[in-house]
């Protein structure tokens, strides 16, 4: 296994243009597929998860061309459901492709097999399958119940009313929302229990609106969608920068001294993870916002105790930022870390302890208490892009850090370590 060693580094300075949002890229690709008309998508993320979606669309007969090193996609919409008769789709570990495609493929008439990497077959999908079965879909598990691989025999999606659990992943609700306008009749989706990661549902609703479909949102407890609609291509659409990816650079400035301006996200962003900068500000960092940029500057950081369910991915960056704060930091209501690319609560706690930090790992929280001197450690990344990027920040201590398998960042940010080197002094 290859590794890289970073630091020790003293300052972080510069300006960064972050790549397109993973969450938005895969949502927009699917909506453009179902829409009437040709869509030109710019600032598309060029990464493994997006390639898995594009490869699947190719197998399903969707026509598109890529330009600008894969960051511009011109896609011919189908003006309705996917018409393929059969598809054997390998989706890697891309939840943003697996979940929405599972629902969208139910709209047509074919037979489809959806599978992925071993970790994908450990990530639950039962709540989504239960909801689709309640809407009349013939969908079965090829392996263990509640987990992929899945086999779908599609015959359209009936309307009516369906309940879906909201406490594991908002992607299950996103999947049904995006397919609901093409259902045979109006659909009311009721959320059973607390809905995690509400900002990701806002991303979905915003993207649907860009393609001409409005959803009645009843305080995130129910959603009403008219059936037998057709998405309309907006012609050209730009994917905003990935707010989770911005978090590492903003945190670097807050930790290290210097000033970093991140372009691609700001006050105009639809992503909830831009609120990460507010958390940094509460810890003491100097933060300035523009419509499409955020700037961070160092100040003395203090530990915080906070519910971070609204920024689950970016909250991981707070766990390593906590190493540089005064006093303990507790990140709460993050059970869904456990069903991501790896069990992130376990992974973060394990690797932080290697550095010498005092860590408490709860069922749905983590407490990190910093120590005066961090240990040099080799950080295992669990094939999880965000673990690798989070722990790069340790390089701004007095101790170098070794990151094992740094190539795992190809899932969402293949050029991360190149850009990291441009801001590091």
From Swiss-Prot:
Q: Which Gene3D superfamilies match?
A: Enolpyruvate transferase domain
Which reactions are catalysed by this chain?
3-phosphoshikimate + phosphoenolpyruvate = 5-O-(1-carboxyvinyl)-3-phosphoshikimate + phosphate
For this chain, the annotated S-S bridges are: none
Instruction: Kindly indicate whether the keyword Membrane belongs to this entry.
Output: no
Q: What is its EC number?
A: 2.5.1.19
Location, primary (coarse class): cytoplasm
Q: For this UniProt entry, what's an example GO CC term?
A: cytoplasm
Which Gene Ontology molecular-function terms are recorded?
3-phosphoshikimate 1-carboxyvinyltransferase activity
What PROSITE patterns does UniProt report for this protein, alphabetically? EPSP_SYNTHASE_1, EPSP_SYNTHASE_2
**Functional pathway:** Metabolic intermediate biosynthesis; chorismate biosynthesis; chorismate from D-erythrose 4-phosphate and phosphoenolpyruvate: step 6/7
Q: Which GO terms describe its biological process?
A: amino acid biosynthetic process; aromatic amino acid family biosynthetic process; chorismate biosynthetic process
Q: What class of enzyme is it?
A: transferase
Binding site residues for phosphoenolpyruvate: 22, 95, 123, 171, 344, 386, 411
- The keyword Amino-acid biosynthesis appears for this protein: yes
Return any one Pfam family short name: EPSP_synthase
Task: Report the family membership.
Answer: Belongs to the EPSP synthase family.
Q: How does it assemble?
A: Monomer.
Q: What does this protein do?
A: Catalyzes the transfer of the enolpyruvyl moiety of phosphoenolpyruvate (PEP) to the 5-hydroxyl of shikimate-3-phosphate (S3P) to produce enolpyruvyl shikimate-3-phosphate and inorganic phosphate.
Q: Which PANTHER family match?
A: AROM/DEHYDROQUINATE SYNTHASE (PTHR21090), PENTAFUNCTIONAL AROM POLYPEPTIDE (PTHR21090:SF5)
Would you tell me the protein name for this molecule? 3-phosphoshikimate 1-carboxyvinyltransferase
Q: What species is given as this protein's source?
A: Marinomonas sp. (strain MWYL1)
Gene responsible for this protein: aroA
């Amino acid at each position: 296994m290859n590794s890289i060693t970073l630091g020790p580094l003293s300052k972080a300075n510069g300006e960064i243009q972050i790549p397109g949002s993973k969450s938005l890229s895969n949502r927009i690709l699917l909506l453009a597929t179902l829409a009437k008309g040709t869509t030109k998508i710019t600032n598309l993320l060029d990464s493994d998860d997006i390639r898995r979606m594009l490869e699947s669309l190719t197998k399903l007969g969707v026509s598109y061309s890529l330009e600008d090193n894969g960051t511009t996609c011109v896609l011919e919409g189908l003006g309705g459901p996917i018409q393929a008769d059969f598809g054997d789709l390998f989706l890697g570990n891309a939840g943003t492709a697996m979940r929405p495609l599972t629902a969208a493929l139910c709209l047509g008439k074919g037979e489809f097999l959806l599978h992925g990497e071993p970790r994908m077959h450990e990530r639950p999908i039962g709540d989504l399958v239960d909801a689709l079965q309640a809407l009349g879909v013939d969908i079965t598990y090829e392996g263990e119940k509640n987990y992929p691989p899945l086999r779908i025999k599609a015959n359209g999606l009936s309307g009516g009313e369906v309940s879906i659990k909201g406490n594991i992943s908002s992607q299950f609700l996103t999947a049904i929302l995006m397919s609901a306008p093409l259902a045979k009749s109006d659909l009311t989706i009721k959320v059973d229990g607390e809905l995690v990661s509400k900002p990701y549902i806002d991303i979905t609703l915003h993207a649907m609106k860009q393609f001409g479909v409005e959803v009645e949102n009843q305080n995130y407890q129910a959603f009403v969608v008219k059936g037998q609609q057709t998405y309309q291509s907006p012609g050209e659409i730009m994917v905003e920068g990935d707010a989770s990816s911005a978090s590492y650079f903003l945190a670097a400035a807050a930790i290290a001294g210097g000033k970093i301006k991140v372009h691609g996200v700001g006050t105009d962003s639809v992503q909830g993870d831009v609120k990460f900068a507010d958390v940094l500000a509460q810890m003491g960092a100097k933060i300035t916002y523009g419509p499409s940029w955020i700037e961070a500057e160092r100040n003395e950081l203090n530990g915080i105790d906070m519910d971070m369910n609204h920024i689950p991915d970016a909250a991981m960056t707070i766990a390593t930022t906590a190493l540089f704060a005064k006093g303990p930091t507790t990140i709460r209501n993050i059970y869904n870390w456990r069903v991501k690319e790896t069990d992130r609560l376990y992974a973060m706690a394990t690797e932080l302890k290697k550095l010498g930090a005092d860590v408490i790992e709860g069922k749905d929280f983590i407490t990190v208490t910093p120590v005066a001197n961090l240990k040099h450690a080799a950080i295992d990344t669990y094939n999880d892009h965000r673990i690798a990027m989070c722990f790069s920040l340790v390089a701004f201590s007095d101790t170098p850090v070794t990151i094992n398998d740094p190539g795992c960042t190809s899932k969402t940010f293949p050029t991360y370590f190149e850009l990291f080197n441009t801001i590091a002094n």
